[in-house]
Amino acid sequence: LHKHLDGRGEGRFKGSAFVRDRIRGKGGGVSSTATHPIGIFDSGVGGLTVVRAVMERLPRENIIYFGDTARVPYGVKSPDTVARYAAQITNFLLARSVKLLVVACNTMAAVALDTITALSPVPVLEVIDAGARSALAASKTKRIGIIATPSTIASQAYVVALRRIGGPEVFTAARACPLFVPLVEEGWLDHPATWLVAEEYLGPLLAEHLDTLILGCTHYPLLRPLLGEVVGPDVRLQDSATAVAERAAAILAEFGLENPSADPPRYTYHVTDMPHRFLEIGQRFLGRPMDDIRLERF
């Protein structure tokens, strides 16, 4: 059973009737599974960009978030290592009875998606297809830049997705930006060092006359104000958070998994290191209290 869902939910999700039979109650009604949480995971704080979009689009849904803050960044690690970490986190979330998994990490989506889907009996959403579709919808010239971690860039996952969806005429220019993730994790969202790094990374891309830039790591939207200043008003910045939230809503509706409860949603955050730093950055970004942060050890 292959449970990976692309941005359209077409062609990549086999066995949907089997899954529907397992998660619907007898007679087609909604089972208690509908009140189960959505599991969202990333290498660190960056996946909160997706959490925020899901909270806004699906305000009744319970969410469990896992940020692997002890082992961030993932983008400079080998595919085998990333796959091993992804398997650990997937099993952690499945043990907590999530009804949907959202891979809010471009590196894991690029190099470990098969590992995740092989383990999961619930639908799996990922960010790369959604980000590619969002960029193509925004671009007028089909000249699209991609910034991401070294692992994501090396995988060519975005280039493949853009050309599969938009055709071979799509022009792409890509740049690995390994320092952005640690800068975001440090909370240096408007620090002089971050400005210098951004100008160094983005200068060669701007010379390619792009009209759209994919923020190909879920950490990068936290730098959106700074990056917008660096690239200027003629370049549209695109990420996948909103598109993933929309697709999550569609999947829950399709399988009768929308939470019917009128109770306030429960948000739980699990991290592997520095919970106080995670709290500081996370509350600033989400604009709401983060009352339940738990430290986990693997």
Residue ranges with predicted function:
Residues G9-E10:
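Compositionally biased, low-complexity flexible segments
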Residues G28-F298:
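Non-catalytic structural scaffold of enzyme domains
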